Amino acid sequence: MQPEPKLSGAPRSSQFLPLWSKCPEGAGDAVMYASTECKAEVTPSQDGNRTFSYTLEDHTKQAFGVMNELRLSQQLCDVTLQVKYEDIPAAQFMAHKVVLASSSPVFKAMFTNGLREQGMEVVSIEGIHPKVMERLIEFAYTASISVGEKCVLHVMNGAVMYQIDSVVRACSDFLVQQLDPSNAIGIANFAEQIGCTELHQRAREYIYMHFGEVAKQEEFFNLSHCQLATLISRDDLNVRCESEVFHACIDWVKYDCPQRRFYVQALLRAVRCHALTPRFLQTQLQKCEILQADARCKDYLVQIFQELTLHKPTQAVPCRAPKVGRLIYTAGGYFRQSLSYLEAYNPSNGSWLRLADLQVPRSGLAGCVVGGLLYAVGGRNNSPDGNTDSSALDCYNPMTNQWSPCASMSVPRNRIGVGVIDGHIYAVGGSHGCIHHSSVERYEPERDEWHLVAPMLTRRIGVGVAVLNRLLYAVGGFDGTNRLNSAECYYPERNEWRMITPMNTIRSGAGVCVLHNCIYAAGGYDGQDQLNSVERYDVETETWTFVAPMRHHRSALGITVHQGKIYVLGGYDGHTFLDSVECYDPDSDTWSEVTRMTSGRSGVGVAVTMEPCRKQIDQQNCTC
């Protein structure tokens, strides 16, 4: 017998026998045989150690495509699902167990864990619509599914039942896109029932953010009293004022008054009633029939009315803080000349946004927020062409990134202080040329009108202003002759000012704010030096005490409170216009420098409100 030849170099296909072949001609009957070993020796290279790898990228898709064709032609199927749902006639679907098990942990357990279905050719399925099961089976073979609004809840429920997580996520994402004031509560309830945590959270967040619109829908009026109380207790409810929550509760009770009037008191205790204005409470006590019919509720609101009008310190109630970014806004300022900048600082990531400029450059202005809108009040335009004191009031809307002019004050006010009580802006002191004002005027946004109120007991420019317990405090300043350490308090019900305990230090151009039921006065100018000292006024003990000093000396600084901490921005240290921003933590009594402004400046207007609409910013910054 001839020895088999040893081959070298590239093999020729004719020299290899196929795995299955017919016997050579003349070798007897033609039968199929298997070649059990390779008869050829191949040495592609000198050492013979080279290897290669090959992957057919779309093999899985092709293989599942073939299996789907087998399913549709009912070939090699090893299970029939008999699906029964309520009164709908049962439907049968033939499939391959291995494919179903590969897409669903429920089917995998059913067909592999020794359950009785493992050996069954016909398996009964209940609790899922046949059309839903048909789509899920098709998804198992094709990795594709098409779902419309009318059936998405059924498909998602079926996907949850059979733990097909990818379909659950797809349905959840679709439903999030469909969220609307009219369906958000229903979607949230559905997600809770099927245990879809992510969809439930997204729907609830939508409800919190759009509470005013949701509260007008039919779904809202179908909430139970417990569900409503839980909803309105949320700190992150997005409302412009607490009266929205109050009216929503009263409307819910009116929807079925005979059955719901018993829940009024419980609901009112969930409303932040101390955030309501005395005028609003007085109107409701006089005109709301539901309150007049419930003596306990009426007494409860009367007590709150008295506490507000008597300016009693109340137990701290968390402010509504919607989960929308809240930024620190800085408007205007001075560096060589007055600036028109509007910028916003995000303490959570340290970023700055450049926004729509003021229509006229201003420094020595004040900033405040009412109903989410930022107001820039007074100031002066210092320019190479001359100096002009301003009586202007401009309103910035973060949703449109636009400024709108409002009614002007009765007189120009440079180096002004402002505070907000009951949604009204109080403009305090300031100067017009060589005139130093003691006058104070109040702006009502609903009417776009200013009205003079009682003047301060002392003329003050560079005055620090803050509001605590519905009282307006004017702190320090300059009267035209002397820098001041005196402070006074305005009682709106009496329309009168009273002196309070003076500060330990003379301060003009200090930053003044309220934190944790105390008034803070930071920095300023004492007639000789810019200051870095900080003192705090306790309204209950009527005493001023020093706290930790700032890192930098500064006067004409901006100041505000964000998430329980004090921020001071810019100012003048006697030599330089500062760009530094410091943050005070009352828990540790420490200051830290957290960022720098885009440029040094003093005399900025500062306030905190919602993050601006990015879409509007991008459109207005577009250069195309």
Curated annotation (Swiss-Prot):
The modification S-cGMP-cysteine is found at C434. One of its GO terms (cellular component) is endoplasmic reticulum. It is found in: Cytoplasm; Nucleus. Changing C151S: Substitution with a small side chain that prevents covalent modification by an electrophile; promotes constitutive ubiquitination of NFE2L2/NRF2 and subsequent repression of phase 2 detoxifying enzymes. Ubiquitin ligase activity of the BCR(KEAP1) complex is inhibited by oxidative stress and electrophile metabolites such as sulforaphane. Electrophile metabolites react with reactive cysteine residues in KEAP1 and trigger non-enzymatic covalent modifications of these cysteine residues, leading to inactivate the ubiquitin ligase activity of the BCR(KEAP1) complex. Selective autophagy also inactivates the BCR(KEAP1) complex via interaction between KEAP1 and SQSTM1/p62, which sequesters the complex in inclusion bodies and promotes its degradation. Transmembrane segments: none annotated. The keyword Nucleus applies. The record marks C151, C257, C273, C288, C434 as: Sensor for electrophilic agents. SMART domains: BACK, BTB, Kelch. GO terms for biological process: cellular response to interleukin-4; cellular response to oxidative stress; in utero embryonic development; negative regulation of response to oxidative stress; negative regulation of transcription by RNA polymerase II; proteasome-mediated ubiquitin-dependent protein catabolic process; protein ubiquitination; regulation of autophagy. Residues 184-286 form the BACK domain. The modification S-nitrosocysteine is found at C151. The keyword Methyltransferase does not apply. Residues 77-149 form the BTB domain. Changing Q530A: Impaired interaction with SQSTM1/p62. There is a cross-link at R135 (N5-[4-(S-L-cysteinyl)-5-methyl-1H-imidazol-2-yl]-L-ornithine (Arg-Cys) (interchain with C-151 in KEAP1)). Keywords: Cytoplasm, Kelch repeat, Nucleus, Repeat, S-nitrosylation, Thioether bond, Ubl conjugation, Ubl conjugation pathway. The modification S-(2-succinyl)cysteine is found at C38, C151, C241, C288, C319, C613. Kelch repeats lie at residues 327-372, 373-423, 424-470, 471-517, 519-564, 565-611. Changing N382A: Impaired interaction with SQSTM1/p62. The Kelch repeats mediate interaction with NFE2L2/NRF2, BPTF and PGAM5. Substrate-specific adapter of a BCR (BTB-CUL3-RBX1) E3 ubiquitin ligase complex that regulates the response to oxidative stress by targeting NFE2L2/NRF2 for ubiquitination. KEAP1 acts as a key sensor of oxidative and electrophilic stress: in normal conditions, the BCR(KEAP1) complex mediates ubiquitination and degradation of NFE2L2/NRF2, a transcription factor regulating expression of many cytoprotective genes. Belongs to the KEAP1 family. This is Kelch-like ECH-associated protein 1.
